């Protein structure tokens, strides 16, 4: 250990200790003594470095360097100089673990940003700027994972990165490539600049294996593709990994991307599934430790750093969705939050923090030896002595004794957390079990046995298992009281399996006898509701607290408005989450009211339609504001500037939505119209034409409504009823809509217009649409031509959608599509409007079938007896269709049970539309 030539190091004692601690420090001193002496003169290596200091140092060293090899040499020498400084500080107790790991992480950030900037210019010169489909220059989003993300890097850590970009597109140069390929090349160069080993060493080892699909997948991924991956393929261990994710470079698009990952990591409900994932990861690590014989690894071995992190992270994943303070990336910060929240005892927090800091100091001492990424205690006496000098222990045995004490405390707490004591229900419940087995068939009995022996149950924490055992007899008792116990049991078991990790729901069901009974009754009537609750357990919150009154329109509007007020306009994922939960929870309320309170059909349809309309109106408002924020307001057709009150945009509901007849699984038939000056530009800094503005509002609306996520989507949307169908523009101006309907539309499109109704958007534009609708529908038409066209369309639907001849022979009747079904009545109502409203304009006023029939009777076009008979038939068939939807059954029913109703409908069909249909039922 030669130090004679180090005349500028005033504190030779500190220098000697540094060199005793680290062979690597000796090597750096031999190679870069002049640099180190200059650095020492500044502050004697005593002061901490701020993030600004570090970024400025990197910038100053690399300033004006154009040559790649020179850039790589300079940054590697800077890294060696700083490593010497940090080893000096650590060996001489001039820093602490938190400060040291923060500075190391800041240096990594600075190097990544510098490498990213240096790598970009040659690519742009060759391929041009990467431009997204929205016309914006695309940036490479660099996400730091693991210790880098948490700003907890150790002395010789690798850095875990993920590369992303906002959206697809192409570069604008002569040698154009797509944005993804550009970002891949960009990322590859960034890695090379930092990771490649030269004569001067490396800067950071770069690990990209945490990206979606890991090794072998594309190096850079779009925001949308990442979101889709997490929703469809994200695994539990990836939730642990993404806790520490941090945007190192990428601006607002990076922030948006990170915000998108939050619901994947932190579930809204208390989520005990995190235990299972932790056990699996721990088992995998234990197998690896045994295979590689690395029990002395202070990170992966029993009681090591990883177990402390697991303890903290499992609580973060379980409770982080409801306790935002637990979402912090840093282990020690989150550990203290766990203590403050009462999730860990204060003494446990103190012991874990003490052990963690000790283990991290040992880790630094090991890595300082030779700048190697290892956490294994050395075997060589010389290296052991260096560690003893750093940590200030007299003998190796003394050190090991202290280390084992810390590891034992961590290990005991970890074991306490993941103990797996699972048994069958207590023998005191044997009598109930016997009663249950007496009424269950063999399949159901096997299901009970498999449930209590399942791996999923064995992975539950003991507290959750105990709650499940407490819940079980209450569940059996409720099943035994059911009129259909076998059916109720089979339908509810998937729900029990779904929520058994979220034991708060089990407790709530136990505490509310009425809720348990309602759940069992509902299960016998509606497997659809059971499946919704099973797939989206968060809806249980609503079910357990609902009063089974149908929701009122004003209450729906107030509720959704209040929820959305708390969300910023650019927090798209949160907006979609609120919209999805609003729709699903309120539809569930309606279904429960339908099943348990036997609410009238018309009121049920009104409520379902209200939920859809409120959702559409709120979504349109969000979409409009988002486009305005980016591009400014458009001008309307008269040249006036639009506003949030005068939007110039409206949504038209067709089909069941327009007819106020929505069912439980109905999609929404929508048409978008606008009143913009299509050529005039918006008044924002990124202006677009009025036509482009209208298109983007509609596209944003559809994205918010139809994007598939873990919570499903808000609604399925069908826009094919717009002018010219799928070949037509997504959004139509009111004037173009008018011209199309008056000059180009087929009669079936006017049929569809009968059930059209403006449901959201600017009031003035909506009124103009309603006036136009009435104008079109009340045109004078040849009654025979209308009859022929209606008949042709109806026959086409029967041929494609109705029951086959073979099915009819077996007594099958399709409630909706066969003769005498719902569509026959709808077509008759539409025929009345198209054929008779020229002379009777009031027929065109309403869009729902019942009121059209009432108006036809009022106008004398239909006898009151016939109108009443049709309404009764229609309501009976629709009520049955609702019941079948809730029961997850098809619309094919026993024809014999519907013969009288069908005869009523078919006789009127024969009289109004098709005299040749007299044998419709007889032929079956």
Curated annotation (Swiss-Prot):
Residues 1-422 are annotated as: Adenylyl removase. One of its GO terms (molecular function) is [glutamate-ammonia-ligase] adenylyltransferase activity. It is an enzyme of class 2 (transferase). Keywords: ATP-binding, Magnesium, Multifunctional enzyme, Nucleotide-binding, Nucleotidyltransferase, Transferase. It comes from the Bacteria. One of its GO terms (biological process) is regulation of glutamine family amino acid metabolic process. CDD domains: NT_GlnE_GlnD_like. The keyword Transmembrane does not apply. It catalyses: [glutamine synthetase]-O(4)-(5'-adenylyl)-L-tyrosine + phosphate = [glutamine synthetase]-L-tyrosine + ADP; [glutamine synthetase]-L-tyrosine + ATP = [glutamine synthetase]-O(4)-(5'-adenylyl)-L-tyrosine + diphosphate. Its EC number is 2.7.7.89, 2.7.7.42. Residues 424-924 are annotated as: Adenylyl transferase. Its cofactor is Mg(2+). One of its GO terms (cellular component) is cytosol. Involved in the regulation of glutamine synthetase GlnA, a key enzyme in the process to assimilate ammonia. When cellular nitrogen levels are high, the C-terminal adenylyl transferase (AT) inactivates GlnA by covalent transfer of an adenylyl group from ATP to specific tyrosine residue of GlnA, thus reducing its activity. Conversely, when nitrogen levels are low, the N-terminal adenylyl removase (AR) activates GlnA by removing the adenylyl group by phosphorolysis, increasing its activity. HAMAP family: GlnE (MF_00802). Belongs to the GlnE family. PANTHER family: BIFUNCTIONAL GLUTAMINE SYNTHETASE ADENYLYLTRANSFERASE_ADENYLYL-REMOVING ENZYME (PTHR30621:SF0), GLUTAMINE SYNTHETASE ADENYLYLTRANSFERASE (PTHR30621). This is Bifunctional glutamine synthetase adenylyltransferase/adenylyl-removing enzyme. The gene is glnE.
